[in-house]
Amino acid sequence: MKSPAPSRPQKMALIPACIFLCFAALSVQAEETPVTPQPPDILLGPLFNDVQNAKLFPDQKTFADAVPNSDPLMILADYRMQQNQSGFDLRHFVNVNFTLPKEGEKYVPPEGQSLREHIDGLWPVLTRSTENTEKWDSLLPLPEPYVVPGGRFREVYYWDSYFTMLGLAESGHWDKVADMVANFAHEIDTYGHIPNGNRSYYLSRSQPPFFALMVELLAQHEGDAALKQYLPQMQKEYAYWMDGVENLQAGQQEKRVVKLQDGTLLNRYWDDRDTPRPESWVEDIATAKSNPNRPATEIYRDLRSAAASGWDFSSRWMDNPHQLNTLRTTSIVPVDLNSLMFKMEKILARASKAAGDNAMANQYETLANARQKGIEKYMWNDQQGWYADYDLKSHKVRNQLTAAALFPLYVNAAAKDRANKMATATKTHLLQPGGLNTTSVKSGQQWDAPNGWAPLQWVATEGLQNYGQKEVAMDISWHFLTNVQHTYDREKKLVEKYDVSTTGTGGGGGEYPLQDGFGWTNGVTLKMLDLICPKEQPCDNVPATRPTVKSATTQPSTKEAQPTP
């Protein structure tokens, strides 16, 4: 779906000639994607709709994950014959024709474990494989074992996995890191991109693009060999995110690519489908019905695209923070996504150079530099003093401060003076007793106040350290770790999200109950423990008093971006 081009001529920035060569070469690879498995709402048609609307299961994900016991077409034919017969029992029909997902076994940790020991003991508990995937299973097979987040999440998730892998590396499980990188490379080769998760109903979208950072992490252990090995898959993923760019005119958008009126190229989140999400079917239908002034398909697309962002859901995407039906994800250009795209371009340049292709390395550097200028020009709110998303409807940078504003610092794309202002804004507006707030808005959505999420704590900590802001970075790590420790001391588990307005409380809001496990919290906790404690005296629990910043080992970045006025 393209947006119309402006009616009057616009000045266009000079786009590097290499960009069209890069995308032309890679688009061929993207077009080789085979026929993909159909999601259950398509396979089962009216049966899927009727089961979900009947609310047979408390969690809509249950039936989306159910495995048909025979050909779905035959099951659907039987359903059509039986559904209007006297005494027909839909629940019985489902029980006969489907194998429902099993409840995960409750993990009871040994008594007396430290926080670190608990996490190290969880890695095998959270490890899964898809060796025995059934023919009509929505679960997509992967060649190697993988670590799932935990709780209701029985599959691997894209951006979760990077932060889980940080912890695996910290625990010395480089074999598991290598397995997960291989799995994601397999998905790119098989489907043309990394889906939201390894389910057929997730194939229409991706998630925040961390694959290049995963390869870079693996290269810490394997050297440049990892960069060279996975260069083709990184290029294919880049082609997926930039698909359609070669035909865009100024002021247009196509799928995940946005070309602004001066020719600046940026990215947005997008889902190729505009129907209710199978895993949240009833909720999405209700959201669309609650706003009759918008086409339902438009709302469905924006709900799905918010899921692609990983922030499902947040006031960040909404016009009215208390009405989910006002979200418009596809008309917002996210600062975190474009920071990750900048990082992908930088890693592609490094990998190309390692592979001996200096010309291609220079082309990726040119693309990264152009994107960096775009971030500085369009995603810095000078009046507020922080990075923010760009609004395609108002043609202005938005005013809301969110934890996503730390991503330019995380990838070393921020100008030094702006990083300093971000440190002040973070400490003033987002830092809470239990860690970093996701936003300052209390909307009831899970990616808003008072919730704090492990990946955003790490992005902020690492980003601030990159620019020498070690005190604020330590404050974030210390506050969040204290929250994690207090919750663990009371409940003997780590959870998906935390209430950062206090310490020792799991977060609330969202479409499902609080989940424990939990992959990315485990990973970030291990990284932060090793950050705040000296290498000579590693800690297995969070110290009782705040450490000094000298234990933080990351050196400040000397890089300064060149802001475009």
UniProtKB/Swiss-Prot annotation:
Catalytic positions are: 312, 496
SUPFAM superfamilies xref list: Six-hairpin glycosidases
Per UniProt, the keywords (alphabetical) are:
Glycosidase, Hydrolase, Periplasm, Signal
Example GO biological process: trehalose catabolic process
* InterPro entries, alphabetized: 6-hairpin_glycosidase_sf (IPR008928), 6hp_glycosidase-like_sf (IPR012341), Glyco_hydro_37 (IPR001661), Glyco_hydro_37_CS (IPR018232), Trehalase_periplasmic (IPR023720)
Localization recorded for this chain is: Periplasm
- Gene Ontology molecular functions: alpha,alpha-trehalase activity
Q: Which residues bind substrate?
A: 152, 159-160, 196, 205-207, 277-279, 310, 511
The record's annotation in Pfam families points to: Trehalase (PF01204)
Extract one GO cellular component term from the record.
periplasmic space
Q: Give all cystine bridges in this chain.
A: none
The signal peptide stretch is: 1-30
The catalytic activity, as recorded, is: alpha,alpha-trehalose + H2O = alpha-D-glucose + beta-D-glucose
Q: Where is the composition biased (Polar residues)?
A: 548-565
**Record flagged with keyword Lipid biosynthesis:** no
Positions in coiled-coil regions: none
Protein EC: 3.2.1.28
Mainly resides where? Answer: periplasm
Note down the stretches annotated as region Disordered: 538-565
Subunit arrangement? Monomer.
Q: Which HAMAP family match?
A: Peripl_trehalase (MF_01060)
Q: Which family does it belong to?
A: Belongs to the glycosyl hydrolase 37 family.
| Known role | Provides the cells with the ability to utilize trehalose at high osmolarity by splitting it into glucose molecules that can subsequently be taken up by the phosphotransferase-mediated uptake system.
Q: What is this protein called?
A: Periplasmic trehalase
- Gene encoding this chain? treA
